[in-house]
Amino acid sequence: MAKILVERRIKALVIACNTATTAALPFLQSMLPDLPVLGVVVPGAQAAVAATRNQRVLVLATETTIAAGAYQNLIKAQCPKAVVNTQACSVLVALAEEGMTDNPVALEALKHYLGNFTTEDTILLGCTHFPVFKKALEHLVPEGVQVVDSAQATAQALKELLRQNELITMSEGVGTIHYLVTDSINRFQRVGAIFLGTSLNAEAIELVDAC
């Protein structure tokens, strides 16, 4: 997929998945030395460190991301005294893709995952599926606990990266969005609408062979 995107003359590449970032970021950065390549883990870790006041952070992520240890290592590298706890929340991925983000099933799952953690003042959403649960989480956690979205932090990091490389467009016009997918267009329309909060035009979606 990266090759296809480069052929489309992109000016920056974001690996918008925590698991893929831990697995592929160094490789893609070495393969594409002339292209700014950004993952979601470093911006997320930086945002968590900036947010925490008691240096106790809970990372909600997939088992693969947690096993890689990237968030734990990056947070502790920036804040050596930090206590970083982790919770694998694989069920949330399926719930998110079904649009079940604020119903009783989702709330019970969130309560289950949060049950053993009471001292952290910062919760880092370490999976790009999880921002759809942010509002529900904020209602469940005690007042003062901050829920940090690694995706939002990455968007800010991308803006700064583009600025540093003088790649920010000066046009005041409204841009267009084109989606390249490797699976069902219909499924992408359904699931994408959940995450983006708006319906997706099928004409803007292109099925490509990334093999």
Q: How would you describe each model-predicted region?
A:
Residues 1-211:
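Non-catalytic structural scaffold of enzyme domains
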